[in-house]
Protein backbone atom coordinates (compact mmCIF):
# COMPACT_ATOMS: atom_id res chain seq x y z
CA UNK A 1 0.00 0.00 0.00
CA UNK A 2 1.27 3.46 -0.87
CA UNK A 3 2.90 5.06 2.18
CA UNK A 4 1.53 8.47 1.14
CA UNK A 5 -2.02 7.11 1.28
CA UNK A 6 -1.42 5.73 4.78
CA UNK A 7 0.10 9.03 5.86
CA UNK A 8 -2.89 10.98 4.61
CA UNK A 9 -5.27 8.64 6.41
CA UNK A 10 -3.34 9.08 9.67
CA UNK A 11 -3.45 12.85 9.31
CA UNK A 12 -7.19 12.78 8.75
CA UNK A 13 -7.74 10.50 11.74
CA UNK A 14 -5.48 12.19 14.28
CA UNK A 15 -4.65 15.74 13.21
CA UNK A 16 -7.71 16.98 11.32
CA UNK A 17 -9.99 16.87 14.41
CA UNK A 18 -7.56 19.11 16.34
CA UNK A 19 -7.88 21.86 13.71
CA UNK A 20 -11.56 22.49 14.38
CA UNK A 21 -12.40 25.42 16.66
CA UNK A 22 -14.46 24.23 19.62
CA UNK A 23 -14.90 24.81 23.35
CA UNK A 24 -12.64 23.05 25.85
CA UNK A 25 -14.47 20.02 27.12
CA UNK A 26 -13.27 17.28 29.43
CA UNK A 27 -14.26 13.63 29.42
CA UNK A 28 -13.78 11.76 32.69
CA UNK A 29 -13.54 7.97 33.07
CA UNK A 30 -13.26 6.25 36.45
CA UNK A 31 -12.75 2.50 36.76
CA UNK A 32 -13.45 0.85 40.12
CA UNK A 33 -13.08 -2.67 41.48
CA UNK A 34 -16.19 -4.44 42.75
CA UNK A 35 -15.47 -6.16 46.07
CA UNK A 36 -17.37 -8.95 47.78
CA UNK A 37 -16.70 -8.20 51.44
CA UNK A 38 -17.31 -11.85 52.31
CA UNK A 39 -13.98 -12.55 50.57
CA UNK A 40 -15.65 -14.74 48.01
CA UNK A 41 -15.71 -14.44 44.24
CA UNK A 42 -17.84 -11.64 42.86
CA UNK A 43 -21.18 -13.07 41.76
CA UNK A 44 -21.60 -11.94 38.15
CA UNK A 45 -25.36 -12.57 38.25
CA UNK A 46 -25.58 -10.08 41.11
CA UNK A 47 -23.53 -7.60 39.08
CA UNK A 48 -25.89 -7.99 36.12
CA UNK A 49 -28.96 -7.44 38.30
CA UNK A 50 -27.32 -4.39 39.85
CA UNK A 51 -26.61 -2.93 36.42
CA UNK A 52 -30.21 -3.44 35.33
CA UNK A 53 -31.51 -1.81 38.52
CA UNK A 54 -29.09 1.10 38.08
CA UNK A 55 -30.42 1.68 34.56
CA UNK A 56 -33.98 1.77 35.85
CA UNK A 57 -33.13 4.30 38.57
CA UNK A 58 -30.88 6.58 36.50
CA UNK A 59 -32.63 6.36 33.15
CA UNK A 60 -29.70 4.80 31.30
CA UNK A 61 -30.33 2.90 28.06
CA UNK A 62 -28.49 -0.33 27.13
CA UNK A 63 -26.14 0.17 24.18
CA UNK A 64 -23.98 -2.97 24.12
CA UNK A 65 -24.60 -6.48 25.40
CA UNK A 66 -22.32 -9.50 25.65
CA UNK A 67 -22.84 -12.81 23.86
CA UNK A 68 -25.11 -13.95 26.69
CA UNK A 69 -27.33 -10.87 26.55
CA UNK A 70 -25.91 -9.07 29.59
CA UNK A 71 -25.30 -5.32 29.51
CA UNK A 72 -21.70 -4.20 28.94
CA UNK A 73 -22.47 -0.55 28.21
CA UNK A 74 -25.43 1.67 29.07
CA UNK A 75 -25.71 5.42 28.63
CA UNK A 76 -27.81 8.44 29.48
CA UNK A 77 -29.19 9.61 26.11
CA UNK A 78 -29.12 13.27 27.20
CA UNK A 79 -25.76 13.74 28.95
CA UNK A 80 -23.78 10.96 27.29
CA UNK A 81 -22.76 9.66 30.73
CA UNK A 82 -22.26 5.91 30.74
CA UNK A 83 -21.94 2.83 32.90
CA UNK A 84 -19.75 0.06 31.53
CA UNK A 85 -17.68 -2.95 32.45
CA UNK A 86 -14.02 -3.01 31.53
CA UNK A 87 -12.46 -6.37 30.61
CA UNK A 88 -14.46 -8.29 33.23
CA UNK A 89 -17.47 -8.05 35.49
CA UNK A 90 -15.11 -7.51 38.43
CA UNK A 91 -14.53 -3.92 37.21
CA UNK A 92 -17.09 -1.20 36.71
CA UNK A 93 -16.56 2.14 34.99
CA UNK A 94 -18.42 5.43 35.20
CA UNK A 95 -17.74 7.77 32.30
CA UNK A 96 -19.04 11.31 32.09
CA UNK A 97 -20.03 12.87 28.80
CA UNK A 98 -18.53 16.15 27.63
CA UNK A 99 -18.25 18.55 30.54
CA UNK A 100 -17.07 22.15 30.82
CA UNK A 101 -17.70 22.55 34.55
CA UNK A 102 -16.11 20.04 36.93
CA UNK A 103 -18.50 21.03 39.71
CA UNK A 104 -21.49 19.89 37.66
CA UNK A 105 -19.66 16.75 36.57
CA UNK A 106 -18.95 15.93 40.21
CA UNK A 107 -22.65 16.12 41.09
CA UNK A 108 -23.54 13.64 38.35
CA UNK A 109 -20.69 11.27 39.20
CA UNK A 110 -21.48 11.04 42.89
CA UNK A 111 -25.18 10.56 42.19
CA UNK A 112 -24.35 7.50 40.08
CA UNK A 113 -21.75 6.30 42.58
CA UNK A 114 -24.15 6.59 45.52
CA UNK A 115 -26.82 4.63 43.63
CA UNK A 116 -24.35 1.84 42.88
CA UNK A 117 -23.03 1.74 46.43
CA UNK A 118 -26.52 1.49 47.88
CA UNK A 119 -27.39 -1.36 45.52
CA UNK A 120 -24.17 -3.25 46.18
CA UNK A 121 -24.08 -2.67 49.94
CA UNK A 122 -27.39 -4.51 50.33
CA UNK A 123 -25.45 -7.66 49.42
CA UNK A 124 -22.29 -6.93 51.44
CA UNK A 125 -20.48 -5.65 48.35
CA UNK A 126 -18.70 -2.35 47.86
CA UNK A 127 -16.85 -0.27 45.31
CA UNK A 128 -13.60 1.37 46.35
CA UNK A 129 -10.93 3.66 44.96
CA UNK A 130 -7.89 1.46 44.43
CA UNK A 131 -5.82 0.82 41.30
CA UNK A 132 -5.42 -2.91 42.01
CA UNK A 133 -8.26 -5.01 43.37
CA UNK A 134 -7.10 -6.17 46.82
CA UNK A 135 -9.50 -9.14 46.60
CA UNK A 136 -8.31 -10.29 43.17
CA UNK A 137 -7.21 -13.65 44.64
CA UNK A 138 -10.82 -14.53 45.48
CA UNK A 139 -12.30 -13.64 42.08
CA UNK A 140 -12.96 -15.40 38.81
CA UNK A 141 -10.63 -13.25 36.72
CA UNK A 142 -12.19 -14.11 33.39
CA UNK A 143 -13.07 -11.87 30.44
CA UNK A 144 -16.47 -10.53 29.51
CA UNK A 145 -17.95 -13.12 27.12
CA UNK A 146 -17.83 -11.25 23.82
CA UNK A 147 -15.49 -11.20 20.84
CA UNK A 148 -13.50 -8.14 21.80
CA UNK A 149 -12.66 -9.06 25.39
CA UNK A 150 -12.06 -12.73 24.62
CA UNK A 151 -9.64 -11.60 21.92
CA UNK A 152 -7.86 -9.23 24.32
CA UNK A 153 -7.63 -11.91 27.02
CA UNK A 154 -6.22 -14.35 24.46
CA UNK A 155 -3.71 -11.78 23.23
CA UNK A 156 -2.39 -11.05 26.72
CA UNK A 157 -2.17 -14.76 27.57
CA UNK A 158 -0.18 -15.49 24.41
CA UNK A 159 3.05 -14.10 25.90
CA UNK A 160 4.75 -17.56 26.09
CA UNK A 161 4.89 -17.46 22.29
CA UNK A 162 7.27 -14.52 22.52
CA UNK A 163 9.81 -15.96 24.95
CA UNK A 164 12.50 -15.54 22.30
CA UNK A 165 12.18 -11.76 22.57
CA UNK A 166 14.64 -9.93 24.78
CA UNK A 167 11.98 -8.58 27.11
CA UNK A 168 10.59 -9.54 30.50
CA UNK A 169 6.96 -10.67 30.71
CA UNK A 170 5.20 -10.59 34.07
CA UNK A 171 2.93 -13.50 34.99
CA UNK A 172 -0.32 -11.53 35.40
CA UNK A 173 -1.82 -11.56 31.89
CA UNK A 174 -5.31 -11.20 33.41
CA UNK A 175 -4.36 -7.81 34.88
CA UNK A 176 -7.17 -6.09 32.99
CA UNK A 177 -9.66 -7.92 35.21
CA UNK A 178 -8.28 -6.45 38.44
CA UNK A 179 -6.61 -3.11 37.66
CA UNK A 180 -8.34 0.27 37.52
CA UNK A 181 -7.42 3.70 36.19
CA UNK A 182 -8.72 7.25 36.34
CA UNK A 183 -8.49 8.79 32.90
CA UNK A 184 -9.32 12.19 31.47
CA UNK A 185 -9.66 13.37 27.89
CA UNK A 186 -9.25 17.05 27.08
CA UNK A 187 -9.99 18.82 23.82
CA UNK A 188 -6.81 20.17 22.23
CA UNK A 189 -5.91 22.39 19.30
CA UNK A 190 -3.25 21.55 16.74
CA UNK A 191 -1.25 24.66 17.68
CA UNK A 192 -0.70 23.21 21.18
CA UNK A 193 -0.16 19.55 20.32
CA UNK A 194 3.62 19.40 20.35
CA UNK A 195 3.89 21.45 23.53
CA UNK A 196 1.32 19.21 25.24
CA UNK A 197 3.24 16.04 24.46
CA UNK A 198 6.55 17.56 25.52
CA UNK A 199 5.37 19.17 28.76
CA UNK A 200 3.05 16.43 29.99
CA UNK A 201 5.57 13.69 29.19
CA UNK A 202 8.11 15.48 31.36
CA UNK A 203 5.45 15.74 34.05
CA UNK A 204 5.02 11.96 34.40
CA UNK A 205 7.59 11.44 37.20
CA UNK A 206 5.80 14.06 39.31
CA UNK A 207 2.45 12.39 38.63
CA UNK A 208 3.93 9.14 39.96
CA UNK A 209 4.65 10.94 43.23
CA UNK A 210 1.14 12.39 43.53
CA UNK A 211 -1.22 9.78 42.10
CA UNK A 212 0.29 6.30 42.65
CA UNK A 213 -2.35 3.95 44.08
CA UNK A 214 -1.65 0.49 42.64
CA UNK A 215 0.02 -1.95 45.01
CA UNK A 216 0.08 -5.66 44.18
CA UNK A 217 -0.26 -6.99 47.70
CA UNK A 218 1.98 -9.96 48.36
CA UNK A 219 4.18 -9.15 45.37
CA UNK A 220 6.20 -6.10 44.37
CA UNK A 221 5.22 -4.32 47.58
CA UNK A 222 7.97 -1.81 46.90
CA UNK A 223 6.18 -0.71 43.73
CA UNK A 224 3.48 1.90 44.29
CA UNK A 225 2.16 1.94 40.71
CA UNK A 226 2.37 -1.62 39.45
CA UNK A 227 0.00 -0.69 36.60
CA UNK A 228 3.02 0.64 34.70
CA UNK A 229 4.58 -2.82 34.76
CA UNK A 230 1.30 -4.51 33.85
CA UNK A 231 1.14 -2.71 30.52
CA UNK A 232 4.81 -2.39 29.64
CA UNK A 233 5.76 -6.00 30.43
CA UNK A 234 2.82 -7.63 28.68
CA UNK A 235 2.16 -8.39 25.02
CA UNK A 236 0.97 -4.79 24.72
CA UNK A 237 4.61 -3.80 25.28
CA UNK A 238 6.17 -6.01 22.59
CA UNK A 239 6.35 -2.81 20.61
CA UNK A 240 7.38 -0.26 23.29
CA UNK A 241 5.93 2.51 21.12
CA UNK A 242 2.47 1.18 21.99
CA UNK A 243 2.75 1.69 25.75
CA UNK A 244 4.09 3.93 28.47
CA UNK A 245 6.06 7.06 27.76
CA UNK A 246 7.61 8.67 24.72
CA UNK A 247 11.38 8.32 24.72
CA UNK A 248 11.77 11.35 22.47
CA UNK A 249 10.57 14.93 22.19
CA UNK A 250 8.49 15.97 19.20
CA UNK A 251 9.23 19.21 17.39
CA UNK A 252 6.63 19.01 14.63
CA UNK A 253 3.37 17.32 13.68
CA UNK A 254 5.34 15.32 11.11
CA UNK A 255 7.46 13.77 13.86
CA UNK A 256 4.32 12.93 15.83
CA UNK A 257 2.86 11.19 12.78
CA UNK A 258 6.15 9.34 12.30
CA UNK A 259 5.81 8.00 15.83
CA UNK A 260 2.19 6.95 15.32
CA UNK A 261 3.27 5.19 12.12
CA UNK A 262 5.72 3.12 14.16
CA UNK A 263 3.05 1.72 16.51
CA UNK A 264 1.62 -1.77 16.05
CA UNK A 265 -1.74 -3.35 15.35
CA UNK A 266 -2.59 -6.63 17.06
CA UNK A 267 -6.29 -7.02 16.23
CA UNK A 268 -8.87 -6.28 13.55
CA UNK A 269 -12.43 -7.35 12.88
CA UNK A 270 -13.64 -9.38 9.92
CA UNK A 271 -17.09 -10.87 9.36
CA UNK A 272 -18.09 -10.04 12.92
CA UNK A 273 -15.04 -11.83 14.32
CA UNK A 274 -12.34 -10.14 16.41
CA UNK A 275 -9.01 -11.42 15.12
CA UNK A 276 -5.80 -11.43 17.13
CA UNK A 277 -2.34 -11.71 15.58
CA UNK A 278 1.27 -10.96 16.44
CA UNK A 279 1.76 -7.21 17.03
CA UNK A 280 2.90 -5.75 13.71
CA UNK A 281 4.09 -2.16 13.08
CA UNK A 282 1.56 -0.27 11.00
CA UNK A 283 3.64 0.31 7.85
CA UNK A 284 4.89 -3.29 7.82
CA UNK A 285 1.33 -4.50 8.39
CA UNK A 286 0.01 -2.62 5.37
CA UNK A 287 2.68 -4.18 3.13
CA UNK A 288 1.76 -7.78 3.97
CA UNK A 289 -0.27 -9.66 1.33
CA UNK A 290 -2.16 -11.56 4.04
CA UNK A 291 -2.04 -12.31 7.76
CA UNK A 292 -3.11 -15.31 9.78
CA UNK A 293 -5.09 -14.38 12.86
CA UNK A 294 -7.12 -16.21 15.49
CA UNK A 295 -10.68 -15.74 16.67
CA UNK A 296 -12.83 -17.25 19.39
CA UNK A 297 -15.27 -19.84 18.07
CA UNK A 298 -18.30 -20.18 20.38
CA UNK A 299 -19.13 -23.63 19.00
CA UNK A 300 -15.75 -25.18 19.75
CA UNK A 301 -15.04 -23.00 22.79
CA UNK A 302 -11.54 -22.39 21.47
CA UNK A 303 -9.62 -20.24 19.02
CA UNK A 304 -9.54 -20.95 15.30
CA UNK A 305 -7.32 -19.54 12.54
CA UNK A 306 -8.54 -17.00 9.99
CA UNK A 307 -6.51 -15.58 7.11
CA UNK A 308 -7.23 -12.02 6.00
CA UNK A 309 -5.82 -9.18 3.92
CA UNK A 310 -4.84 -5.83 5.47
CA UNK A 311 -7.03 -2.85 4.56
CA UNK A 312 -6.62 0.89 5.04
CA UNK A 313 -9.83 0.84 7.09
CA UNK A 314 -7.95 -1.22 9.70
CA UNK A 315 -6.57 2.07 11.02
CA UNK A 316 -9.68 2.15 13.20
CA UNK A 317 -8.13 -0.71 15.20
CA UNK A 318 -4.82 1.06 15.76
CA UNK A 319 -4.96 1.64 19.49
CA UNK A 320 -2.07 2.43 21.77
CA UNK A 321 -1.79 2.70 25.54
CA UNK A 322 0.51 5.68 25.93
CA UNK A 323 0.32 7.85 29.03
CA UNK A 324 -0.58 10.71 26.68
CA UNK A 325 -2.60 9.42 23.73
CA UNK A 326 -3.86 11.46 20.78
CA UNK A 327 -7.35 10.21 19.87
CA UNK A 328 -9.53 10.45 16.78
CA UNK A 329 -11.85 12.79 18.72
CA UNK A 330 -9.40 15.70 18.73
CA UNK A 331 -8.54 15.00 22.36
CA UNK A 332 -5.49 13.94 24.29
CA UNK A 333 -6.25 11.15 26.73
CA UNK A 334 -4.17 11.15 29.90
CA UNK A 335 -3.95 7.51 31.00
CA UNK A 336 -1.24 7.12 33.64
CA UNK A 337 -3.20 7.88 36.83
CA UNK A 338 -4.45 5.08 39.05
CA UNK A 339 -8.00 5.16 40.34
CA UNK A 340 -7.95 7.45 43.36
CA UNK A 341 -9.73 7.18 46.71
CA UNK A 342 -13.29 7.98 45.70
CA UNK A 343 -13.53 11.24 47.64
CA UNK A 344 -10.49 12.48 45.66
CA UNK A 345 -11.73 11.34 42.25
CA UNK A 346 -11.80 14.77 40.63
CA UNK A 347 -8.24 15.73 41.53
CA UNK A 348 -7.06 13.90 38.39
CA UNK A 349 -9.19 15.88 35.95
CA UNK A 350 -8.61 19.15 37.82
CA UNK A 351 -4.83 18.72 37.80
CA UNK A 352 -4.67 18.14 34.05
CA UNK A 353 -7.25 20.79 33.22
CA UNK A 354 -5.52 23.45 35.31
CA UNK A 355 -2.12 22.70 33.79
CA UNK A 356 -3.53 22.71 30.27
CA UNK A 357 -4.70 26.27 30.97
CA UNK A 358 -1.10 27.11 31.95
CA UNK A 359 0.50 24.92 29.28
CA UNK A 360 3.26 27.26 28.18
CA UNK A 361 4.22 28.17 31.74
CA UNK A 362 4.40 24.45 32.56
CA UNK A 363 6.53 23.78 29.50
CA UNK A 364 8.92 26.59 30.40
CA UNK A 365 9.16 25.43 34.02
CA UNK A 366 10.03 21.84 33.09
CA UNK A 367 12.41 22.94 30.33
CA UNK A 368 14.49 25.10 32.65
CA UNK A 369 14.38 23.31 36.02
CA UNK A 370 17.40 21.24 37.11
CA UNK A 371 15.93 19.21 39.97
CA UNK A 372 14.80 16.36 37.70
CA UNK A 373 16.23 17.05 34.29
CA UNK A 374 19.54 17.97 32.66
CA UNK A 375 21.20 15.42 34.97
CA UNK A 376 21.46 12.40 32.68
CA UNK A 377 18.04 10.81 33.30
CA UNK A 378 15.04 10.76 30.96
CA UNK A 379 11.45 11.28 32.11
CA UNK A 380 10.77 7.59 31.51
CA UNK A 381 13.73 6.49 33.63
CA UNK A 382 12.67 8.81 36.44
CA UNK A 383 9.09 7.54 36.45
CA UNK A 384 10.31 3.95 36.53
CA UNK A 385 12.38 4.82 39.60
CA UNK A 386 9.71 6.89 41.34
CA UNK A 387 7.04 4.16 41.12
CA UNK A 388 9.54 1.97 42.98
CA UNK A 389 10.19 4.66 45.60
CA UNK A 390 13.77 5.03 44.36
CA UNK A 391 15.54 8.32 43.61
CA UNK A 392 18.79 9.05 41.74
CA UNK A 393 21.43 10.36 44.17
CA UNK A 394 21.55 13.78 42.49
CA UNK A 395 17.94 14.60 43.34
CA UNK A 396 17.48 16.96 46.25
CA UNK A 397 14.38 15.97 48.23
CA UNK A 398 13.86 19.61 49.22
CA UNK A 399 14.28 20.74 45.63
CA UNK A 400 11.86 18.09 44.41
CA UNK A 401 9.32 19.16 47.00
CA UNK A 402 9.60 22.78 45.86
CA UNK A 403 9.13 21.74 42.23
CA UNK A 404 6.00 19.73 43.01
CA UNK A 405 4.61 22.73 44.89
CA UNK A 406 5.28 25.03 41.93
CA UNK A 407 3.48 22.62 39.60
CA UNK A 408 0.47 22.41 41.92
CA UNK A 409 0.37 26.19 42.14
CA UNK A 410 0.37 26.40 38.34
CA UNK A 411 -2.57 23.98 38.19
CA UNK A 412 -4.42 26.03 40.82
CA UNK A 413 -3.80 29.25 38.90
CA UNK A 414 -5.05 27.61 35.72
CA UNK A 415 -8.27 26.54 37.40
CA UNK A 416 -8.71 29.98 38.95
CA UNK A 417 -8.39 31.52 35.49
CA UNK A 418 -11.35 29.39 34.36
CA UNK A 419 -13.50 31.10 37.00
CA UNK A 420 -15.55 28.01 37.91
CA UNK A 421 -14.42 27.59 41.54
CA UNK A 422 -12.67 24.31 40.78
CA UNK A 423 -9.49 24.97 42.77
CA UNK A 424 -10.70 22.95 45.78
CA UNK A 425 -10.39 19.75 43.73
CA UNK A 426 -6.63 20.11 44.17
CA UNK A 427 -6.81 20.04 47.98
CA UNK A 428 -6.04 16.30 48.19
CA UNK A 429 -2.90 16.85 46.10
CA UNK A 430 -1.70 19.70 48.31
CA UNK A 431 -2.26 17.44 51.31
CA UNK A 432 -0.18 14.68 49.71
CA UNK A 433 2.51 17.22 48.82
CA UNK A 434 2.74 18.49 52.39
CA UNK A 435 2.94 14.93 53.73
CA UNK A 436 5.24 13.72 50.90
CA UNK A 437 2.87 10.82 50.31
CA UNK A 438 0.26 9.37 47.97
CA UNK A 439 -2.58 6.84 48.35
CA UNK A 440 -0.31 3.83 47.77
CA UNK A 441 2.20 4.96 50.39
CA UNK A 442 -0.64 5.78 52.79
CA UNK A 443 -2.01 2.27 52.34
CA UNK A 444 1.35 0.60 52.92
CA UNK A 445 1.88 2.73 56.01
CA UNK A 446 -1.53 1.75 57.39
CA UNK A 447 -0.79 -1.94 56.85
CA UNK A 448 2.61 -1.58 58.53
CA UNK A 449 0.86 0.01 61.51
CA UNK A 450 -1.39 -3.03 61.91
CA UNK A 451 -4.50 -1.81 60.10
CA UNK A 452 -6.31 -4.36 57.92
CA UNK A 453 -6.80 -4.15 54.18
CA UNK A 454 -10.52 -3.84 54.98
CA UNK A 455 -9.74 -0.62 56.84
CA UNK A 456 -8.13 0.73 53.68
CA UNK A 457 -10.97 -0.46 51.45
CA UNK A 458 -13.54 1.34 53.58
CA UNK A 459 -11.42 4.49 53.86
CA UNK A 460 -10.87 4.70 50.11
CA UNK A 461 -14.47 4.03 49.08
Task: Give a label for each model feature.
Residues 176-182:
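Short, conserved phosphate-binding/catalytic loop or strand-edge motifs used
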Residues 108-113:
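Well-ordered, non-membrane alpha-helical segments in soluble/globular domains
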Amino acid sequence: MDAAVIRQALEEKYLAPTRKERPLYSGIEVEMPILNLKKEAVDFDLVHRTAERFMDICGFVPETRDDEGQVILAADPVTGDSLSFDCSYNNIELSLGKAQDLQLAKIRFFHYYDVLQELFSAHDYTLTGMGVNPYRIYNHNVPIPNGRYRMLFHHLHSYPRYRSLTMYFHHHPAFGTFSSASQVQLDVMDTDLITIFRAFSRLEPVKALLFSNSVLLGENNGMICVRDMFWENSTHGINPHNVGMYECDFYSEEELLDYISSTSLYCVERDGKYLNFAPTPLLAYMELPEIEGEYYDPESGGFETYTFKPELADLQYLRTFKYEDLTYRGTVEFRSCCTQPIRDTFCVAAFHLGLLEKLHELDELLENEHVLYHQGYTASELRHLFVRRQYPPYISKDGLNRLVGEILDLARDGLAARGMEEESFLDPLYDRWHRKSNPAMDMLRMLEEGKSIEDVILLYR
